[in-house]
Amino acid sequence: MHFRAITRIVGLLVILFSGTMILPGLVALIYRDGAGRAFTQTFFVALAIGSILWWPNRREKGELKSREGFLIVVLFWTVLGSVGALPFIFSESPNLTITDAFFESFSGLTTTGATTLVGLDSLPHAILFYRQMLQWFGGMGIIVLAVAILPILGVGGMQLYRAEMPGPLKDNKMRPRIAETAKTLWLIYVLLTVACALALWFAGMPAFDAIGHSFSTIAIGGFSTHDASVGYFDSPTINTIIAIFLLISGCNYGLHFSLLSGRSLKVYWRDPEFRMFIGVQLTLVVICTLVLWFHNIYDSALTTLNQAFFQVVSMATTAGFTTDSIARWPLFLPVLLLCSAFIGGCAGSTGGGLKVIRILLLFKQGNRELKRLVHPNAVYSIKLGNRALPERILEAVWGFFSAYALVFIVSMLAIIATGVDDFSAFASVVATLNNLGPGLGVVADNFASMNPVAKWILIANMLFGRLEVFTLLVLFTPTFWRE
């Protein structure tokens, strides 16, 4: 294990991260909201930490293998999440405990969107901008992590793809080097962000809010600059714009890359994961619209459809924006939408959850077993697109599902043990392990009422969800540390 080379990389990341404090610092200057000191302090502290880690090891160029890759990925999120908590700790408004500061930082960086803050409308603009920025940078990291790095390590939904499928693979990357891949992906990411911000601005959203919500929309994060979330703007047009960009961001970025490379829009519909993703969204929209209309929750059919469309896409893509309190909806719908987050977005997207591709393969395997009951001697292969998948891939899906279920059950029991009621414990684990954000019960609006121990468990869940479980679990195996 090349610890010095790993330390050099982590130090460099912290130095780069310190530079991002300049942006909220400028916002503090523009709005004169008094929050600039917190970001100035964080800049110098982060720069010092990064320099201490990087300078003594700056000439270490040891060849990094997959084991080092796992450790670097985990350290990337844990170290930056910890440094990201500093502005919340240094800031006088909001006055957060250390636990809440870490919760807010990790929630932002992992694009979970769960919050302990109340009174967002009265917070300094710089703090509000910083929360949105955390999610946006987290989303940039997720795209490269999901599409370029984890497949090389043999982890993540993208490893399920093979040569004829769009997107980078272990044996067929978009670009020969991660740096090249990252540049292409980030270009797409930035273009989508600019397009989203302009669309929201033209729809009547103030410039500050438009930029902030474009950050959290493209990152599928869910943080807002207002307590009422997107409902603050009370605009069906804004609801529709955000929902459309959430759907775009919930797609595999490999498909966006294919379109950017000159291929036709048909590349999307040829992808079985994309077809299932859209199918799930449409089915949920129809169900929600019919139930809301039957119960006369809204005055008109158009309002009902708009609210159903927005809320379904927001929850099912794991963004977690709200336009209305879904607690006043028939209980069936909030629970259905919470469970839809288990499916989440496509592999290679900023969405959370199990990922559509895994759910698709689980269904295909279930269907195969039913056929085998009728024809025990028949040989059935499972295909993705036009290619039969090897059993090793299918075993990996079941392995991931088992590990995910184990983490889910252990987390829920641990939170119940801290004194949280069972329904709220279930909802909080669903919201954090799937990187969704809002839950039900005592965490329907925010997580401020959760006890400190439960919050640390939920922080761990955010990391498990964002790092696709195995990336974090492998560090706890003796084999990983054995030379």
Curated annotation (Swiss-Prot):
Transmembrane feature ranges: 3-29, 36-57, 66-90, 125-150, 178-202, 274-294, 390-417
Segments on the Cytoplasmic face: 1-2, 58-65, 151-177
MF annotations from Gene Ontology: potassium channel activity; potassium ion binding; potassium ion transmembrane transporter activity; potassium:chloride symporter activity
UniProt-listed GO biological process terms: potassium ion transmembrane transport
Ion transport is among the record's keywords: yes
Pfam families (UniProt xref): TrkH (PF02386)
Primary location class: membrane
Matches recorded under InterPro entries: Cat_transpt, TrkH
Annotated region described as Selectivity filter part 3, given as residue ranges: 317-322
Renumbered residue ranges of the record's region Selectivity filter part 1: 110-115
Region spans: Selectivity filter part 2: 219-224
Sequence segments annotated as region (Selectivity filter part 4): 434-439
Domain of life the protein comes from: Bacteria
Record-listed K(+) binding positions: T111, T112, I220, G221, T318, A319, N435, L436
Residue intervals annotated with topology Periplasmic: 30-35, 116-124, 203-205, 225-234, 323-330, 418-419, 440-451
Function description: Low-affinity potassium transport system. Interacts with Trk system potassium uptake protein TrkA and requires TrkE for transport activity.
PANTHER family from the UniProt entry: TRK SYSTEM POTASSIUM UPTAKE PROTEIN TRKG-RELATED
Record-stated family: Belongs to the TrkH potassium transport family.
Name this protein carries in UniProt: Trk system potassium uptake protein TrkH
Organism: Salmonella typhimurium (strain LT2 / SGSC1412 / ATCC 700720)
Lineage: Bacteria, Pseudomonadati, Pseudomonadota, Gammaproteobacteria, Enterobacterales
Gene that specifies this protein: trkH
